[in-house]
Amino acid sequence: MPRKVVFEGQIEHLQILDENGKVDPEIGVPEGLTNELLVEMYKEMLFFRRFDKKALALQRTGQLGTYASLIGQEAAQVGLGYAMNEKDWLVPSFRDQGLMMLRGVPGHKIITYWNGDERGSQYDEGVNCLPICVPVGSQLLHGAGL
């Protein structure tokens, strides 16, 4: 089979913070991103990590069923959660526990879900979140049209 070129171009790297945590002066800090908001978001990440560690401990001692850890996803979930509007819907994957809590799903519902109880997927009215989808990649199809 003859060879053919399938890509020509360049890939750019965007770095907002340098290695010392300083913001690039050309880019600057996004409007509305205050120190207070950053601290609030950081506290959310810490809470998600503590929640996750507790859930993992429960799972490893046989007190919780299958559980997919969110470790390493905290910042992405907080960033997305804070960027979403109140009317936006979340179609979570199996590692989106933090994002679900930001959207109004109580932590005990998430634990109930991972213990195999369908009541863990019943959320209060006004919580725009579908139940967790475990199959990888199915969220896009489920979210289409919401």
Predicted segment positions?
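Charged, compositionally biased N-terminal leader segments and the immediate start
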Residues: 1-29
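A generic structural signal for short, non-catalytic loop/turn and secondary-structure boundary residues
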Residues: 7-10, 38-40, 83-85
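N-proximal short alpha-helices
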Residues: 10-14, 49, 115
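N-terminal glycine-rich anion-binding loops that anchor highly charged ligand groups
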Residues: 15-21, 43-56
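Short, contiguous, helix-prone interaction/anchoring segments in small proteins
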Residues: 32-43
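Active-site-adjacent structural elements in enzyme catalytic domains
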Residues: 37-38, 47, 75
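Cofactor-binding active-site loop characterized by glycine-rich and histidine/acidic residues
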Residues: 50-53, 57-146
